[in-house]
Amino acid sequence: VILLDEPTERVCAAIKSGRLAPVRLAIVAPGGYGKTAVLDHLAGAPGVRLVDDAHLLTDAELSEVARQLDDESAGLVIAARPHPRPAALNQVLGRLTGQLVLRPFDRPRTETFLSRAGRPLAVDSVLAQTGGVPGFVRLLAGGDGELVAAFRHELDQAGEDSLCYLLAVEAGADPDLLAALKLPASTVEAVRATGYLGPDGRLLPVAARALRELVPADRRIALRLRLIRRQLDRSGPVLSLVRPLIGAGVTGADVATAFEVAAGEATGEPALAARLYEAAVRAGRRTAAVGTRWAEAVARAGDFDTALQLADQVIGSDDAADRAEGAQVAGAALAHRGQLARSAELFQWSDTAAARCFAVIGLTGSGRLAEAEKLLDKSSVDGPPTLLAGAVSSAARGVLESVTDQPTVALSTLIRSAEMLEPVSDRVLLPDSPAALGALVALHSGEAAIAEPLLERAVSSGVLVPRHRLLLAWIAMLRGDEEGANAQLRSAGEQLSPRDWLFAVGLRVGLARRASDLAGLRRIWIQAREAVVRHPVDLFTFLPFGEFEVAAARLGERDRLAPHLRQARELLAGLGDPPLWASALHWSGLHAAVIAEQPEEAAAHAEALAEAASEGPYFATIARAAGCWLKVLGGEVDAPEVESAARDLHGVGLCWDGARLAGQAAIRTSDRKAMVTLLDCARVLQGRPGREAVEHTGGVRLSERERQVAELVVAGLTYKQIGDRLFISAKTVEHHMARMRQRLGAGSRGELLAELREIVQVAS
């Protein structure tokens, strides 16, 4: 099969027709470009001698070709590679009058060639592998056997230097390293003449594949080791050279050093860096020499158990030079596992500047305020005032300020810390991020609008992404955006640290409760119970523990959570009951008491919230709402007051809570007008978009409310669950069902459900 481009076709046609007689033409191109195919195409052209592979002819043979040129009427077309170029060949080429340029296939020619060859291969893949070199496209279309045979012949003809050069290029050697091999200058030209290299000097994938299949592995490894030693001598990068040797069983001091150096180059790929450190140890490097960096890489890759094991070996090794750094890695891993108190102890033992700041965060989070303040006072930067040092120090100060100062002060400090850390966040293994800590402070003070962009920027940095996505999901849940919360929850993935898993379970519990999905809540509660047992309470886990408290009340399992809530209260007491953090626990406690119908307990939480009302608008809002809840529980519903409180809750980001307050007040009032007003308020705050009435295929039209009831009945919810979801009574749901049954002419409940399923399907 031959497929020439249009200019080449025109020239060949002119030669065959005699219009170019006498033709004196050279075709000089690397192997695979189709020189022989062109000569085959010209076979039979009148008065034209065709000479192939002229670069391989002897001087005597070339002299005989040159003598033919003495006859001015004789035609000659010579095909040759650019190398070798003996003097006799140059003399012949110098007497020719033109040159035919052969080009690689473009996409249309590749597609046409494959179609004619009857090979349904992906065109883009073929081009990527072959660089469009026509001969390689043909070989690829012919199958592996033909491909390997052709390359075997070429490699058998290649000299030792050419093969060395090809193997070096396949190994990823850059031009400087290739030059360091000190191969003859002609070697590069000889290799280029094979057609194996692309325009950028890199090996074409199809040629690299052939080398790997045809050259024994021990020879390829030996050449790679030679390159590695040269690169180490010149302090050059070795990652691309070393990476294929992982798992190859190669050992020795040079190899171990190369693996270690490569791991340092792979900090942006922690899983790869961890494998390289492991390979260094297998090659002969002592674990104590690389253990801390290995542990950090493993931790960055999310394997905190292995990170702790490795770091512990370093800490327990008397001859390890970086025991302090090992303790810092262990402290960070423990923080991700939710062991904040133990984490703080390791950070204190480490006693580096960064570790002391991390210890302040851990001590504060575990309720040890005096120790945290003392440690921050004596903390100083050991080295230069870098961005990283400033960011870590500010994070510690911001967390402490969240307990001892105004929330706005703490939030401002943590935001500055997050901004400072952004350009250098990949330089240290963080126990938590300033962005996450700032978002927690923002969520506890009603500043979700500040938390959201802070978290989005943190997600884009690529550090602690699941942590930041889960907090974005929390914001969406509080706003009543179930779809957005679930999307962020899914984006966080399944491979979560214990701390992130706690938040993920808390989100699922919160979403099920807000959807009045009692069956779903019972299912996820099994995980919630496990999370509560496995994860100690700390200051930064009040959000999920608050959700667990309310859900426990809904499921009648408050006793199971009581010891953990007692720990939370003791922790707060150790910090002086800071309003920022205490209010969140009292707010969830209030709702748990409301669900459990414990008015005295609810009153105690409402009183605590009232005492914190002066801390800021958010705290005043939830204190006022708590007072409304107490009145509603007592049967006293002041519609304007409830509506105002509900709208204020919506304004501080507690959209679902605001809608629930209005809805529950509506259900409990005996004033028909007040009920309608509050129900309308609840629907508006919940953000339910109104839709037109749905028409059944039989012509019966359902109202918006009937359609909502129908969807929830078909979904399997009980009348009480539907009432809770729509802020109406179960009796009203029953009334809607009776009306729909009558209008649809259903003779039984089964018929009614079948009709409703059809209507819901049509509507969707």
Predicted feature descriptions by range:
Residues 161, 173, 199, 236-239, ...:
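Alpha-solenoid helical repeat architecture
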Residues 281-282, 312-316, 344, 348-352, ...:
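Amphipathic alpha-helical segments of tetratricopeptide repeats
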Residues 94, 102-138, 164, 226, ...:
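Amphipathic alpha-helical segments of the small helical/lid subdomains adjacent to P-loop NTPase cores
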Residues 24, 220-301, 310, 639-661:
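Extended alpha-helical scaffolding segments used for macromolecular assembly and cargo binding
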Residues 112, 119-153, 186, 190, ...:
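Amphipathic alpha-helical "lid/sensor" segments that cap RecA-like P-loop NTPase cores
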Residues 691-764:
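Helix-turn-helix DNA-binding segment
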Residues 37, 64-122:
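Alpha-helical sensor/transducer elements of the RecA-like P-loop NTPase core
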Residues 36-38, 144-151, 170-175, 183-229, ...:
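Short capping/hinge segments at domain boundaries that bridge a core fold to an adjacent linker or tail
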